[in-house]
């Protein structure tokens, strides 16, 4: 909680029982590639200054990104969400991708995109 990760944060292929990253600030690239989250995952009000990648990760319980801010490209491609997933009030300054991801429970995607239509890739 309330932690700042200066430079890059590399959690590739890690395992978390409960991931408590509330109010965390990632000043460099945040890599959670192929990471398993077995318990509650909290990223409320977290700030990702640059790229964030959660590709091929598995969230076995609830994951909450309420009011998180993503300033760089973000990927959840090929991830599995087994619990309730909440992205309520998140802000995205760049592209966010959930390509080939699977959601098995109720999902709240009240996302605010700050990308103009001309910047989006269709």
Where is each model-derived feature located?
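N-terminal leader/targeting and pre-domain segments
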Residues: 1-122
